[in-house]
Amino acid sequence: MTVKYSINELLVDHESLSDNFTCPICFDLYYSSSSKKEVFQCRDGHLACKSCWSDSLLNKKECMICRTPVNSMNELSRNRFIENEFLKKKVYCPNSFFFIENVNVDDSSMNEALIRDESNGCKEIITVEALEKHQVECQFRFEKCPFTGCDKILRLKQIAEHKIDCKFSSKYCLHCDKEIPGQLDAHALVCPKVRIQCTQSESCKKSFPREQLRLHIDQDCKFTIVKCKYCCLNNSKNESIDFKRFELADHYEKVNHSFEMDKVINNQQLELVECKNQIYQINNKYEKLLERVIKLEQLSMDASNKLSLLPRFKNSIIFATFSTHKLKRVNEGISTVPLDVGNNKFKLTLYPNGYDESNKGNISAYLYRVSINEPAVKVSFTFVFNNQDSRKNRTYRIQEYTFNGGATSGWGYPKTLKTVDVDSANGWLTDEDKLVIGLRIQVLP
């Protein structure tokens, strides 16, 4: 649990801040609520945060202050001196304030929400650079009570004392060998391992774990009421068919059940015949289903063999000096040479700044058929935008699309990566300024 704050509220000496530490465009400090911002400058030394530069260069290729031409982020230099100087500023520990729930960091009332806790708060004054590490180690940070059901939020130093008296604290049950939240007395009334006496009759003196009670009553307890399995078939003699389990053996010995037993045997024989018929029918159904499965497996194998014989293309496409292409206008694309896939030719076309105005600022990727006077062809195709960190690769797949014969036709994704994000810092470009896209094309039957 952390105190919500803006870095401006933690500063010990606001007067020591100069305009050099504030972005002249968005007027925010060069530091977010949890990490420093990157500061970039034009060749004439005018500063702004990275996000402001990125947004501005999408509209105008110039410095926002002096109008010096700036074609891309690669033409800016990073001002680490300003970044590091801000990290040396002194701040109060966030845990010097009271914890207040449901406070938004961006709320305009934030200054009113943060209140110093002079009695119990942290007294440390640290640098901005040490802030994150200190918060992890601070003994005055806020923690939620670990016991289920307790919603109290306390300082770490107060948790140990609170746990002693917390009504939701866990207790160890010797019977079930578990930590139990709440009171042990209440748990003992339902604990499956607590030994209890049989509840079927006071005459039964046996005891066992609670979880075995139902099994004992159903199968073992001699005082459980049971029925004679024969008398229920013919009760014309008005004999009682309910007995305590220990009386049943005596009943079977004294009463002749031969007639009833014959009925049971006859019924079982009829049931046996019915079961045999059902087994025969099930076996027939099984044989038919097995035949269908074999046929389907053969069809699947034939389809796979046919698909493997169909034309396909798989290779990596490299777009060199891609940073220069990011300056292209909307609907201005760059294409590969024609790629042979069987009797068809295709080309991959990228629109670095969008195919049209609706996807401006995004890279649009389309596959075009350039074969002339060829019949329609159905394909599946995949674009894989490769990142230096392969875990971040982006895959875009079209399961099925039919390219019509004759006229040039194309299909793809109007929005893939954001244009501004495609640089070497984010891993989308190599050190040689190359964008690498894996392309797979499969002709379908």
UniProtKB/Swiss-Prot annotation:
Residues 314-441 form the MATH domain. The keyword Zinc applies. A zinc finger (TRAF-type) spans 133-186, 186-242. GO terms for cellular component: cytoplasm; endolysosome; pathogen-containing vacuole. GO terms for molecular function: ubiquitin protein ligase activity; zinc ion binding. It is found in: Cytoplasm. Residues 269-307 form a coiled coil. The keyword Heme does not apply. Keywords: Coiled coil, Cytoplasm, Metal-binding, Repeat, Zinc, Zinc-finger. SUPFAM superfamilies: RING/U-box, TRAF domain-like. Pfam families: MATH_2, zf-TRAF. InterPro entries: MATH/TRAF_dom, TRAF-like, Znf_RING/FYVE/PHD, Znf_TRAF. GO terms for biological process: defense response to Gram-positive bacterium; lysosomal membrane organization; plasma membrane repair; protein localization to endosome; regulation of gene expression. A zinc finger (RING-type) spans 23-67. Probable adapter protein and signal transducer that links members of the tumor necrosis factor receptor family to different signaling pathways by association with the receptor cytoplasmic domain and kinases. Belongs to the TNF receptor-associated factor family. A subfamily. The MATH/TRAF domain binds to receptor cytoplasmic domains. This is TNF receptor-associated factor family protein DDB_G0290971. It comes from Dictyostelium discoideum.
